[in-house]
């Protein structure tokens, strides 16, 4: 006995989803406004498990949303603002058509606006949630900040993105929060640690833009509108944590300039914005009352495991503090041909001082003739006169030193020298993975060991000698092993023949002197271990054995891939050596 019979597609998963057109009509919005609202609110389409049931038996391609998400959008106050804006555009078009200029001005003054503050608070209840979602916001804002002022994007949006990204970079410099840098084909990847949260973003290279035609800039502009609001909130909170003025104010401004601009901040004028964007000056801090020294925490005795963890944590913190002061006490000068903003940002983030030619950009703090300069970053060999006591290195030295957490030897980065490979700091090799020789050398440097590099000529000679020596030694060893095996077999045959002869003659067997055979304990232990492993596999259930075989197959595949990479590297090194030999043998 049941209730009333329900029609098909009126219960179950069919009632949990709604098509995009139905949702749009329910909200009374155009497709562009509906898409914009979904981006701002974080609503995205869902793919039903049984699409045919949800689509009422049809197999046509449709976009589905959860019905509860659309009901959630019904109460959004921005929807009314979208409708008001639609009416505003209609009235403005009508006023332009009738040439009623007073009406046009009045309508523009009363243009409907909306804020996204409540959406930010709704989507990110805590500040940590906002930091975890900051990667895409930073990448998009850095991209828009490099756009030219064309009709594709609003100029105000480009300027806002530039201001917010400069503010964030100044916070990273002040907090010494930068951890990793990587130069890729797409751009420069940065990783910073803010309040314990790793944040990774990418900035494009400073090349001229050619806007592609297959990109929907309206969708990107909607995302940027949301991300700029989010980044503004985050910057304000981060500046408060460090007691910095927000909007940022340059440190050491002249009193006359400060009085003339009383009540205004650094970003209110274009010249101050350029000085901030130079990243060469520090920010002014809010004067706070001196706080009492914190009381030292009593240390209580703990067990061995806890003390080992605390010791590891202490060492890690010490290494991190040392990493933050990597370039402290060093003065850099940047030549015209190097990427100024990226290098200035990285050097300042690790405590170094940086400057450039005054004619290149505003914000230079010292000239190239300064005798205190320790490193000059160049990318064109033989263009300047060398100064004694100054290292002329290529830009990659700065990036590699940051990733290595130490100042690398400058010999491999001199001007005109072929640079070593730029290793990614985001790759961590596991057991069985291929580790390139450069990474092994870097790990040895981090441990404080001497990599023991030899000159290439010495390496080649040693390899040739080793190859010849190895061939001779292998031949001698094989001959010795064969002789030993043949001798032992002959001795055994002679002993057995003597015993058989004694038995036939009826004599009592007598003890004969033999040779002492020493057992290889290591080999016996390996045999026992392999036997125990084989027995354990035999005792496994069918499902466990299948899982074990899959794990072992994955390990073997990883080893094969590592061996393949090692062979490729070996072939590459041999090709480089042969090319160098050919160059040496070629008559000039």
Curated annotation (Swiss-Prot):
- Does rRNA processing count among this protein's keywords? yes
Q: Does the keyword Protein biosynthesis apply?
A: no
Which stretches make up the BRCT domain? 322-415
Q: What is its main location?
A: nucleus
Q: Name the UniProt key words of this record, in alphabetical order.
A: Acetylation, Chromosome, Isopeptide bond, Nucleus, Ribosome biogenesis, rRNA processing, Ubl conjugation
Q: Cross-referenced SMART domains, in alphabetical order?
A: BRCT
List the signal peptide residues: none
Q: Name one Pfam family in it.
A: Pescadillo_N
Tell me what this protein is called: Pescadillo homolog
Q: What is the lineage of its organism?
A: Eukaryota, Metazoa, Chordata, Craniata, Vertebrata
């Amino acid at each position: 006995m049941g209730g009333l019979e329900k029609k098909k597609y009126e219960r179950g998963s069919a009632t949990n989803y709604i098509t995009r057109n139905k949702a749009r009509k329910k909200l009374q919005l155009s497709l562009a406004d509906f898409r914009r609202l979904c981006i701002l609110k974080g609503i995205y389409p869902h793919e039903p498990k049984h699409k045919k049931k949800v689509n009422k038996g049809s197999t046509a391609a449709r976009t589905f949303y959860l019905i509860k998400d659309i009901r959630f959008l019904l109460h959004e106050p921005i929807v009314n603002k979208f409708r008001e804006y639609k009416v505003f555009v209609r009235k403005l078009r009508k006023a332009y058509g009738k040439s009623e200029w007073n009406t046009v001005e009045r309508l523009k003054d009363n243009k409907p606006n909306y804020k996204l503050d409540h959406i930010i608070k709704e989507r990110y209840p805590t500040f940590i949630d906002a930091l975890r979602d900051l990667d895409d916001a930073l990448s998009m804002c850095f991209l828009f900040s490099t756009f030219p002022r064309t009709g594709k994007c609003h100029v105000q949006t480009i300027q806002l993105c530039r201001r917010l990204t400069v503010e964030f970079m100044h916070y990273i410099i002040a907090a010494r929060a930068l951890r990793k840098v990587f130069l890729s084909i797409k751009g420069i990847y940065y990783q910073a640690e803010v309040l314990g949260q790793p944040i990774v973003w990418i900035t494009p290279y400073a090349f001229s833009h050619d806007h592609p035609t297959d990109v929907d800039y309206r969708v990107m502009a909607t995302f940027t509108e949301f991300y700029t609001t989010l980044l503004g909130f985050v910057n304000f909170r981060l500046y408060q944590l460090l007691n910095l003025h927000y909007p940022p104010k340059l440190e050491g401004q002249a009193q006359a300039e400060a009085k003339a601009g009383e009540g205004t901040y650094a970003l209110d004028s274009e010249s101050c914005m350029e000085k901030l964007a130079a990243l060469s000056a520090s920010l002014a801090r809010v004067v706070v009352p001196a706080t009492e020294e914190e009381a030292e925490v009593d240390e209580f005795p703990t067990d061995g495991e806890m003390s080992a963890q605390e010791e590891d944590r202490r060492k890690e913190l010490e290494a991190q503090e040392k990493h933050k002061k990597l370039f402290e006490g060093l003065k850099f000068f940047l030549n015209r041909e190097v990427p100024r903003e990226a290098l200035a940002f990285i050097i300042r983030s690790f405590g170094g001082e940086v400057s450039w030619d005054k004619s290149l950009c505003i914000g230079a703090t010292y000239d190239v003739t300064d005798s205190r300069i320790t490193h000059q970053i160049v990318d064109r060999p033989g263009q300047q006169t060398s100064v004694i006591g100054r290292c002329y290195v290529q830009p990659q030295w700065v990036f590699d030193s940051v990733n290595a957490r130490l100042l690398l030897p400058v010999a491999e980065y001199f001007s005109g020298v072929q640079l070593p490979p730029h290793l990614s700091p985001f790759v961590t090799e596991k057991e069985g993975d291929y580790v390139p020789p450069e990474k092994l050398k870097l790990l040895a440097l981090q441990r404080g060991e001497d990599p023991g590099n030899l000159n290439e000529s010495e390496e080649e000679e040693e390899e040739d000698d080793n190859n010849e020596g190895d061939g001779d030694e292998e031949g001698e060893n094989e001959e010795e092993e064969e002789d030993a095996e043949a001798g032992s077999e002959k001795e055994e045959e002679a002993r057995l023949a003597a015993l058989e002869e004694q038995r036939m003659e009826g004599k009592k067997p007598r003890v004969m002197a033999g040779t002492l055979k020493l057992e290889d304990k290591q080999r016996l232990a390996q045999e026992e271990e392999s036997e125990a492993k084989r027995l354990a596999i035999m005792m496994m259930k069918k499902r466990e054995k299948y899982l074990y075989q899959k794990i072992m197959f994955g390990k073997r595949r990883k080893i094969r891939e590592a061996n393949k990479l090692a062979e490729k590297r070996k072939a590459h090194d041999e090709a480089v050596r042969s090319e160098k030999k050919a160059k040496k043998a070629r008559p000039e």
